[in-house]
C-alpha cells in the first residue's frame, strides 16, 4: 500500500469517547456526533475516528475509540454538551495512506497499511493512537474514502 510521511499539526477535536467492539461503537458514536453537530450548528473541518488499541491484543469489549470532529483551537464546548469531550490529537510525523472502503470493511485497509509499514526500512510505528479522516459521506455514496494516519519516527540504524 502506498503512503507518505507527513508532518501534521496537532488537531483540536470534539466528540465522544466510546469503549466496546468498534463495529458497534464507531457507528453509534458518529450517530451521536451528527446529532450534536447539527443541534449546535457546528461546522466541522473534518470527521475523524481515533483508535487507541490493537484489536489483535485487546478484547473487543475493551477497545477504545473517539468519534470526533476537528474544530478550531479556540473552540469551547457549547452549553448542554453532556458527554462530549474536547481533546487533542498530537501533531508530529505520521504515515498517511488513502483507501476506499467498500462494504464497511474498515479493518482490511488498516491491516494492509500496517503490513506495509512493518516492512518500512526508514520509519517505525509509535505506540500512539491511529486515526482516520473521512473524505466523503459513505452513507450517501455507498463507499468511504478515508485517510489513515499512523504516528511514526525514523528508525535509528
From Swiss-Prot:
Question: Where does it localize?
Answer: Cytoplasm
Q: What induces it?
A: By DNA-damaging agents and by the entry of cells into the stationary growth phase.
Required for interaction with DNA gyrase and inhibition of its activity as annotated region, ranges: 89-96
Q: A Pfam family in this protein?
A: GyrI-like
Q: Which SUPFAM superfamilies match?
A: Probable bacterial effector-binding domain
What the entry lists under SMART domains is as follows:
AraC_E_bind (SM00871)
Cellular component annotations (GO), alphabetically ordered = cytoplasm
Keywords recorded for this protein, A-Z: Cytoplasm, Stress response
One Gene Ontology term of the biological-process aspect is: negative regulation of DNA-templated DNA replication
Stated family:
Belongs to the DNA gyrase inhibitor family.
NCBIfam families, alphabetically?
PRK10016.1
Q: Which HAMAP family match?
A: DNA_gyrase_inhibitor (MF_01896)
Complex formation = Interacts with DNA gyrase. Interacts preferentially with the holoenzyme composed of GyrA and GyrB, but can also weakly interact with the individual GyrA and GyrB subunits.
Described by its record, this protein's role is as follows: Inhibits the supercoiling activity of DNA gyrase. Acts by inhibiting DNA gyrase at an early step, prior to (or at the step of) binding of DNA by the gyrase. It protects cells against toxins that target DNA gyrase, by inhibiting activity of these toxins and reducing the formation of lethal double-strand breaks in the cell. Protects cells against the natural plasmid-encoded toxins microcin B17 (MccB17) and CcdB, and synthetic quinolones. Can also protect cells against alkylating agents that act independently of DNA gyrase, suggesting a more general role in protecting cells against DNA damage.
Query: Any idea what this protein is called?
Result: DNA gyrase inhibitor
- Its source organism is Escherichia coli (strain K12)
Q: What is the lineage of its organism?
A: Bacteria, Pseudomonadati, Pseudomonadota, Gammaproteobacteria, Enterobacterales
Q: Which gene encodes it?
A: sbmC
